[in-house]
Structures are given as C-alpha cells and as structure tokens.
Amino acid sequence: MSEQFPTSDNVDIMLFSEGTYPYVKGGVSAWILQLIEGSPQYTFGVCFIGAQEIMDGKKLEISYRFPENLKHLEVHYLFDNDSAPLAKRIKGSKEGFEAVENLYNSFKDIKNDIPKILQNIEFYTKEVTFKDFLYSERSWEFISKTYEENCPDVPFVDYFWTLRNIHKPIWVLAEIVQNLPKTKVFHAPSTGYAGFLGALSSYDRNKPLFLTEHGIYTRERKIDMLSADWIEYKKPSLLQQPEEYNYIKRMWVNFFDKIGVFCYHRSNHILSLFSGAQKIQISFGADASKTQIIPNGVDVDTLKATMKNRQEIPKKIVTLIGRVVPIKDIKTFIRAIKIASETMPEIEGWIVGAVEEDSEYVDECQQMAISLALKNKKQIFDGNKSDMTAEEIENSADKIKLFGHSDIKKILPKSALQTLSSISEGMPLVILEGFAAGVPCVATDVGSCRDLIEGGINEEDIALGKAGAITGIANPAALAKEYIRFLNFENGEWKKAQEIGLKRVEKYYRQEMFLKDYKKLYDNAIDLSWDQLFEKVN
C-alpha cells in the first residue's frame, strides 16, 4: 500500500493514534478501524504519533486499509532529530522558564497540578518556543539547577537527555495542534502522548474530548518504560548505584501519571472496556461521574460462519493471537506447550501476531523453542513475512509455529483452544473473536480476561458459566494443566466451554452494540462546544 494520505480541512471526529493505526498491528489499531468503518455517518481524521520513523533499521509501513470515511491522516514522530529547529544561541524568557520550572515540579511530584498557563497553546509558540527550550541559556540554567538540586550523583548526561526527552514532545505536540483540521469532536484511544495531544487540542479549540482507555496506559508504561530505544542512559553495571536508575525511572513514571491526569481533567467522557479498568481510572485521578463502560464488540455473524470449516473433533492446537512482544509473555506460552507435550505429544502451539515490533524478542522466543526441542530451526522474517509459506509452517513437524500477522478467519477454525499468557491486557478482542468462532480460551488473570471467560457483565452473564479457564501470570505449569484438561475431548469440557463462549459473545459483545453506544455519544456532542457538552452532561 503506497503512502498516499487523505487530507481534509474539516472532519467530524479526530482520533489520536499513539503507535497504533495505521502502522502497527494490534488490538487498538483493529478497534480504530472497526470504529471508523462501522460509523459511516461521520467523517474521521487520524493523527498518528510515533517515536521514530525508522525502527530497528526499517521504515514503518502502512498495515491497514483506509476506509472511505477516513478523510484525513497525518503522521508525526516525537523523537526524530529532523523535527528540531537549527541551533542558535539565545537568552530565553525569564517568566517563561519560571512556568517551565513549575511544569517540571508538577512532573516531579504527583501531588502538584500542571500549571494552568500550559493549557494555552500560545505558551508554547510565544512564551517559551521549541527553540527556547532546546538552545537558550535559561534552558541550560534550568537543567543545571534541577540536576544539582535533585540528583547530583546521577551522571549529568543521563539526566540531561532524560529531562530533554520528557519535555521535548510537549512542544512537538503543541505544533501539531496549531495545524489540525477543523474538528467537531476529539477522541483519544489512550492517555499518554495521544491523551495530552487530545487535551491540548480541546483546550485550544474548545471542542469536546472523549477518552477511551483500552489498557491503563500509565500502568503499562511502568512495565516497559526502560525498553524504549530512545531512553539511553547505560552505565557499566558495576558502577551503578541502585538509586541512579530509580530516580530517572521515577521522572518518567511521574510524567506519564501527570499527563494522564491532564487528559482526565479535560475529557468530557472517560470510557473504559470493563469495570476493573473503570475502578483503576478513578484511582488514577479520573472523575467518577465522567466514567462509563463500553465493552468491545466483534462481528459475531462473520466469525460464526467460519465454524463450517471446523473439524468436528479439532486437532490439538493451542493458538496465541497477539504481538510477539515481552508484555504478551510468549516465553511462558512456549514453556507451557513443552510441559503439556510431555503428557499430550500431539499438542501444537501456534503463535499468530505481528513480529516486526521487537525482533530481538522474536529471536529469543525462537531460540527458546529450538532449545526445548519444540522447533527445528529459526524462521527468518522480513517485516511480518516469513521465509516459509503458511502451508509450510502448518505442515512442519514443529510443535511451536510462528505465523506472523495472519487472517484469523483462517486460523481460528483450525484451533481447538485460544490462549493469552500476557502480563498486562485491556479487553482483548481476540478472546471474543475466538468465542464467536467456537474457540474456548485459557488466559492469565489480567485485564478483563476473567470477566470475558467467567462472566462479569451481570449475574446472568456469570450464570452462563465458564468459556475456558483463568490462571496466574508467569505460570506455565498451570496453563499446561488447563490445555490438557480441555484438549481431552472425551470429558466434554471443551464442548461445554465452546457453547458458553458462543452464548456470551452473542448476548453481550456484538459489534452492533458497541457502535450504537458510540453513535449515541457522538450525536450528543458533535454540534456542541466543550463548555456546552460539559453543562449538558453534568
């Protein structure tokens, strides 16, 4: 697909996509596409923000189609060096840097609010410009002063680049706001940079802002923050002091906490996918009166139709559909298949999901499978494309098979069980898609997995029963035990779980329900200012 982006001066809804649609395959990207395609009555724009255009030596490529009602797409990178203005020695504004110091103090201490002046886009374009922040004498004085006051034992170069990288995106985002098309409703699918951009846009245009959190962004950043390749402050381990990394990590954690609250405060509606996430939002600073649950929905009829391609007694294939990244804990799944294979030699583990995001982790997973005698040799991937065809992978003697991102309508009919071994999830669409295709699920107790598998909407949902099983995280033996239980088809457990999953997804998680809920919210807001909607719903 060539990178010919649609552009428009005017859209109904602007979605802010942080590292997801249209480049990165995954659940949030699929949700964005589903929302746009399922809402043809509105015109949409997407503002994509990523870290860098070149990742692991390769340029990001478009991974999803553009629906007809996607009228505008723009792409920005927060940490590409070519976004910085040319260096020039300047003094900088005293008053402006007092505000920057207040901003810094608000990031440093979660109890402090972000200064009100920073809600105004003119602060970033007139008071303290991007050039002021990068090159002025007052900026250097500010960084030097805060370093001496807070962490003089940390190497200055580490502190300098951390502080720069924390603050730099704010000016990049402010510049984006100035050039966005005319928009009726802003919608962020996460807090973080996307949520900050949404809040800043809403303040600038006085237009409504919706926030939909698929996972709890701040909590997930605490898990994987130091894995980003733009946070570079390595030091020989023998020379490290325990507090060195703790202070710099705390700076990042507080930053994401703070911009999350900034987005919560500005959002007219704060949406989550399940009750557990709603409670976490409130504990992180969201106004409970603004929160609402809208579960994901799937195209039940299309997926249910794939059951005609299913064998009456399926092969003993356990499929993990998800990106091959550490947060999905693919290694625990591989270990679980090894344990299960000692009791059930015919079992196979299929890994179906994007492999281009973390090539080092993909290599580690393949090497583990080879060392456990579950895989014969390493596959070579060019982006998401394997050096083996899907047919060759399926027919190989391997017990662990990597398919890359694939059409689940072809994968699910061949799968007996679906699994997730993740250490963090929001509300995984893949579980619901599996239910609709007649595939029970064994998953770790993260996000809404328990609610989906055991029921959580209401008492009637719970009474339906269990459409699979839940285990603890990082417990391959527990996963293996459940795989063996369900794949012993004679005991009737698999058939019972399949029927419960089909009933649950039909009753509570149809795509039409999800789209109807968003249509109601959009219709209620689309002709109003932020203030008018605030008065209407409060």
Question: Where are the language model's segments positioned?
Answer:
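Nucleotide-activated donor-binding/catalytic signature segment of Leloir-type glycosyltransferases, i.e.
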Residues: 239-243, 362-405
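Carbohydrate-associated surface elements
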Residues: 276, 297
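Conserved donor-binding/catalytic core segment of Leloir-type glycosyltransferases
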Residues: 301-339, 350-352
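Aromatic "clamp/platform" in nucleotide-sugar-dependent glycosyltransferases that forms part
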Residues: 423
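Short glycine/serine-rich donor-binding loops of glycosyltransferases
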Residues: 428-431, 449
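Short hydrophobic beta-strand element within catalytic cores of glycosyltransferases
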Residues: 440-443, 447-454, 460-462
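Conserved acidic donor-binding segment of nucleotide-sugar-dependent glycosyltransferases
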Residues: 455-476, 486-491
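A short, well-ordered alpha-helix in the C-terminal region of glycosyltransferases
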Residues: 463, 467, 492-508, 514-520, ...
